[in-house]
Amino acid sequence: MESRLLDTLVCPVCKGRLDFDRARAELLCRADRLAYPVRDGIPVMLESEARQLDAAPADTA
């Protein structure tokens, strides 16, 4: 994911920072423990599409 885009995007729930998990193609909000999918290179920034992160910290690439 392009770093300029990543610097611009924020979590739609808390407006916090997102980290890109390249291996899973997801944008991670650690504050809300949500992972937003990136499909065909397009971030899907809908809370209804996000999955809940496990209690263990996720690795980012």
Curated annotation (Swiss-Prot):
Any Pfam family matching the protein: Trm112p
InterPro entries xrefs: Trm112-like
Transmembrane region(s): none
Protein origin, superkingdom: Bacteria
Gene3D superfamilies with a match to the protein in the record: 2.20.25.10
Cellular component, GO annotation: cytosol
Membership in a protein family: Belongs to the UPF0434 family.
Protein name: UPF0434 protein Bpet2671
